[in-house]
Amino acid sequence: MNEAVKTLDGWFCLHDFRSIDWAAWRELNPGNQELMLNELSHFLSDMEITKNIGEGEHTIYSILGQKADLVFFTLRDSLEALNEVENRFNKLAIADYLLPTYSYISVVELSNYLASHMAGGDDPYQNKGVRARLYPALPPKKHICFYPMSKKRDGADNWYMLPMEERQQLIRDHGLIGRSYAGKVQQIIGGSIGFDDYEWGVTLFSDDALEFKRIVTEMRFDEASARYAEFGSFFIGNLLLSEQLSKLFTI
């Protein structure tokens, strides 16, 4: 049997995509709308406290197209904590007007090979650079791109039948492309084998949305992607600050 890849795991992630029920929202009087938005604001203030004490992260983006209107991206140190946030959000009055359209569960991961290389032989979990990758601060970039992906298991193009050394070399070459976009695109890789329908959830952040097109296009021509990758739906959106929510929901 081929050797399975070993990973270091950090925060658990929930991408929660919602569509606004504008027809139902319009039926509410402005007073009720304001009460719901205030309740949402208090919820987000509590989320900010958790972020400030280093026990999690979150961000909100407005999604383009008809797949969703919003994505709430939340990171926590356990599935229980993540589920608690999800349940509390669903109990908000405004949640009745935010219809679920898609979700994705994963855990921020780093390959043991890369983590050991970064740590130089020391305990990777005590290395500042490794910890920054496993427990990332979400950048306030203008745009987000999220997509799930898996590795193929199709005849000769079966990623999991390749020897470990060949997989490592392919990933190393693939990673060089990503590193060439340092400063332009920040990525968070969430492992989701056994958690969701695909094997990874990829989240990209950038101030220039065209960088998403450039990096994904370039990676498509790399062998690790061209031969062995399968992709789900892509979601792209714009940063939505908490103070901008009232404007979004104003009819």
Curated annotation (Swiss-Prot):
Gene3D superfamilies per UniProt: Apc35880, domain 1
SUPFAM superfamilies: Dimeric alpha+beta barrel
Required cofactor names: Fe-coproporphyrin III
Reaction catalyzed: Fe-coproporphyrin III + 2 H2O2 + 2 H(+) = heme b + 2 CO2 + 4 H2O; Fe-coproporphyrin III + H2O2 + H(+) = harderoheme III + CO2 + 2 H2O; harderoheme III + H2O2 + H(+) = heme b + CO2 + 2 H2O
Cross-referenced InterPro entries: CHDC, ChdC/CLD, Dimeric_a/b-barrel
UniProt GO molecular function: heme binding; metal ion binding; oxidoreductase activity, acting on the CH-CH group of donors, oxygen as acceptor; peroxidase activity
Superkingdom of origin organism: Bacteria
Name of the molecule in the record: Coproheme decarboxylase
